[in-house]
From Swiss-Prot:
EC number: 3.1.11.6
Compartments where located: Cytoplasm
Source organism phylogeny: Bacteria, Pseudomonadati, Pseudomonadota, Alphaproteobacteria, Rickettsiales
GO molecular-function terms, A-Z: exodeoxyribonuclease VII activity
Family membership noted in the UniProt record: Belongs to the XseB family.
Keywords assigned: Cytoplasm, Exonuclease, Hydrolase, Nuclease
GO CC aspect terms: cytosol; exodeoxyribonuclease VII complex
Protein name: Exodeoxyribonuclease 7 small subunit
HAMAP family: Exonuc_7_S
Coiled coil: none
Organism: Rickettsia felis (strain ATCC VR-1525 / URRWXCal2)
Protein backbone atom coordinates (compact mmCIF):
# COMPACT_ATOMS: atom_id res chain seq x y z
CA UNK A 1 0.00 0.00 0.00
CA UNK A 2 1.38 3.38 -0.97
CA UNK A 3 0.27 6.60 0.64
CA UNK A 4 0.90 8.89 -2.29
CA UNK A 5 -1.37 11.80 -3.11
CA UNK A 6 -2.31 10.16 -6.41
CA UNK A 7 -3.60 6.72 -7.22
CA UNK A 8 -2.31 4.53 -10.01
CA UNK A 9 -4.87 4.69 -12.83
CA UNK A 10 -4.25 1.07 -13.78
CA UNK A 11 -5.51 -0.33 -10.48
CA UNK A 12 -8.71 -2.28 -11.07
CA UNK A 13 -11.99 -1.57 -9.35
CA UNK A 14 -11.75 -4.89 -7.52
CA UNK A 15 -8.20 -4.24 -6.30
CA UNK A 16 -9.12 -0.75 -5.10
CA UNK A 17 -12.22 -2.00 -3.32
CA UNK A 18 -10.31 -4.81 -1.61
CA UNK A 19 -7.63 -2.40 -0.40
CA UNK A 20 -10.29 0.04 0.78
CA UNK A 21 -12.01 -2.72 2.77
CA UNK A 22 -8.68 -3.65 4.37
CA UNK A 23 -8.07 -0.02 5.35
CA UNK A 24 -11.52 0.24 6.93
CA UNK A 25 -10.86 -2.92 8.98
CA UNK A 26 -7.50 -1.59 10.19
CA UNK A 27 -8.94 1.78 11.18
CA UNK A 28 -11.94 0.17 12.89
CA UNK A 29 -9.56 -2.13 14.75
CA UNK A 30 -8.03 0.91 16.44
CA UNK A 31 -4.56 -0.61 16.70
CA UNK A 32 -2.81 1.81 14.33
CA UNK A 33 -1.00 4.92 15.46
CA UNK A 34 -2.76 8.21 14.82
CA UNK A 35 -0.35 9.12 12.01
CA UNK A 36 -0.77 5.74 10.32
CA UNK A 37 -4.55 5.94 10.67
CA UNK A 38 -4.59 9.41 9.09
CA UNK A 39 -2.40 8.21 6.21
CA UNK A 40 -4.64 5.18 5.77
CA UNK A 41 -7.70 7.41 5.79
CA UNK A 42 -6.14 9.61 3.09
CA UNK A 43 -5.39 6.53 0.97
CA UNK A 44 -8.95 5.34 1.58
CA UNK A 45 -10.37 8.58 0.18
CA UNK A 46 -8.27 8.16 -2.97
CA UNK A 47 -9.47 4.58 -3.33
CA UNK A 48 -13.11 5.57 -2.77
CA UNK A 49 -12.86 8.25 -5.44
CA UNK A 50 -11.20 5.79 -7.83
CA UNK A 51 -13.97 3.23 -7.27
CA UNK A 52 -16.65 5.87 -7.84
CA UNK A 53 -14.94 6.91 -11.08
CA UNK A 54 -14.77 3.29 -12.31
CA UNK A 55 -18.45 2.75 -11.44
CA UNK A 56 -19.45 5.92 -13.28
CA UNK A 57 -17.48 4.85 -16.36
CA UNK A 58 -19.15 1.43 -16.29
CA UNK A 59 -22.61 2.97 -15.88
CA UNK A 60 -22.04 5.34 -18.81
CA UNK A 61 -20.80 2.50 -21.00
CA UNK A 62 -23.85 0.39 -20.12
CA UNK A 63 -26.15 3.33 -20.90
CA UNK A 64 -24.42 3.81 -24.26
CA UNK A 65 -24.72 0.12 -25.10
CA UNK A 66 -28.38 0.08 -24.08
CA UNK A 67 -29.19 3.16 -26.19
CA UNK A 68 -27.40 1.72 -29.22
CA UNK A 69 -29.13 -1.63 -28.86
CA UNK A 70 -32.54 0.01 -28.36
CA UNK A 71 -32.22 2.38 -31.31
CA UNK A 72 -30.81 -0.03 -33.88
CA UNK A 73 -31.56 -3.46 -32.58
CA UNK A 74 -28.01 -4.32 -33.63
CA UNK A 75 -24.86 -3.60 -31.73
CA UNK A 76 -21.57 -3.49 -33.59
CA UNK A 77 -18.33 -4.00 -31.66
CA UNK A 78 -16.98 -0.69 -33.02
CA UNK A 79 -19.89 1.23 -31.49
CA UNK A 80 -18.94 0.36 -27.92
Amino acid sequence: MTNTKTLEENISFEEALKELEEIVKKIDNGQESLETAVNSFERGILLKNHCEKKLKEARLKIEKITKLADSTGVLEETEV
